[in-house]
């Protein structure tokens, strides 16, 4: 008998993925494969909206608290290891449920990777020099002109992927978007059912605003202060990409004296809304998903849990 497909629950930040995946896993006796590139790091708890301890104790979550900040872990590492764990769980008769919103993690697992050209040190050095001279906005506008679809998925302030995208265009003569259409495919022997939670924009933004306030009340400032005291040199030299995460970046800048705490909180909410918009653009343009209405109340959650359990159990 052929195995049922693996359920993948994706959606923008604050859309309810964590709660939905937990309930399905609890009902089916399953385990959760977390596709979140920041929750994998220890000491980044409040700002990454990790599931609470009682959830982690009740249902096994993979790829949460498995790495120290600074340990390398790429989208390729995730795709390979997630496929291995899915196979292991199935061999033990356990239902795996993938849930998360990290775009490159999800794309790597579901579609595989495109063959991208190797980095060219001369081109990369020149682009970095142009970044220093003209700033990230100028390079972002250039990418918008050449590859608007890729630009929509990027945070203009995170320059590593911006430079890499422009480098690929110069080396290959084509865009990242065009190259990504030719991927290596999903892992052998695993089929996926991919659903994405769709919420009215005003509801999603209100959830983001409320969650930002809740994070601050839960101690995000103190959590970030601990990280700032430990990693301020790495932050200033931009050596740790994890520290550029929304929620931490703004508070690091507050500790550096760039603005007051109230402004930092407002920026966290604003930047999180921007991130959610980029996630939605990515899911719609780059992944093959079934959009479902995100539940707005308890009855809606229970109905969706029942419906999705039928697909996989």
Swiss-Prot record:
GO terms for molecular function: ATP binding; tRNA dimethylallyltransferase activity. Its cofactor is Mg(2+). Keywords: ATP-binding, Magnesium, Nucleotide-binding, Transferase, tRNA processing. Its EC number is 2.5.1.75. Pfam families: IPPT. The record marks 102, 124 as: Interaction with substrate tRNA. GO terms for biological process: tRNA modification. SUPFAM superfamilies: P-loop containing nucleoside triphosphate hydrolases (SSF52540). It catalyses: adenosine(37) in tRNA + dimethylallyl diphosphate = N(6)-dimethylallyladenosine(37) in tRNA + diphosphate. It comes from the Bacteria. It is an enzyme of class 2 (transferase). Substrate binds at residues 13-18. ATP binds at residues 11-18. Residues 36-39, 160-164 are annotated as: Interaction with substrate tRNA. Monomer. Belongs to the IPP transferase family. NCBIfam families: miaA. Catalyzes the transfer of a dimethylallyl group onto the adenine at position 37 in tRNAs that read codons beginning with uridine, leading to the formation of N6-(dimethylallyl)adenosine (i(6)A). PANTHER family: TRNA DIMETHYLALLYLTRANSFERASE. This is tRNA dimethylallyltransferase. It comes from Chlorobaculum parvum (strain DSM 263 / NCIMB 8327) (Chlorobium vibrioforme subsp. thiosulfatophilum). The lineage of its organism: Bacteria, Pseudomonadati, Chlorobiota, Chlorobiia, Chlorobiales. The gene is miaA.
């Amino acid at each position: 008998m052929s195995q049922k497909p693996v359920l993948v629950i994706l959606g923008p930040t604050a859309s309810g993925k964590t709660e939905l995946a937990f309930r399905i896993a609890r009902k089916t006796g399953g385990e959760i494969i977390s596709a979140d590139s920041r929750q994998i790091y220890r000491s980044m708890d409040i700002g990454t909206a990790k599931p609470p301890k009682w959830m982690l104790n009740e249902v096994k979550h993979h790829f949460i608290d498995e790495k120290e900040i600074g340990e390398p872990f790429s989208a390729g590492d995730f795709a390979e290891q997630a496929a291995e764990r899915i196979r292991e769980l199935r061999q033990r008769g356990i239902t795996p449920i993938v849930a998360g919103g990290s775009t490159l993690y999800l794309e790597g697992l579901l579609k595989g990777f495109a063959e991208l050209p190797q980095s060219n040190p001369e081109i990369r050095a020149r682009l970095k020099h142009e970044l220093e001279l003209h700033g990230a906005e100028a390079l972002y506008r250039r990418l918008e002109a050449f590859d608007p679809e890729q630009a929509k998925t990027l945070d203009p302030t995170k320059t590593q992927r911006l430079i890499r995208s422009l480098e690929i265009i110069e080396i290959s003569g084509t865009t990242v978007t065009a190259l990504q259409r030719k991927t290596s495919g999903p892992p052998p022997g695993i089929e996926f059912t991919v659903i994405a939670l769709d919420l009215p924009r005003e509801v999603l933004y209100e959830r983001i605003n409320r969650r930002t306030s809740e994070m601050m009340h839960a101690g995000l400032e103190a959590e970030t202060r601990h990280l700032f005291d430990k990693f301020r040199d790495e932050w200033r030299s931009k050596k740790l990409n994890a520290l550029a995460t929304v929620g931490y970046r703004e508070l690091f800048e507050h500790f550096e004296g760039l603005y007051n705490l109230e402004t930092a909180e407002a920026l966290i909410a604003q930047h999180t809304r921007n991130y959610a918009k980029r996630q939605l653009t990515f899911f719609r343009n780059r992944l093959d998903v079934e959009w479902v209405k995100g539940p707005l109340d308890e009855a809606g959650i229970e109905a969706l849990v029942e419906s999705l359990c039928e697909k996989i159990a």
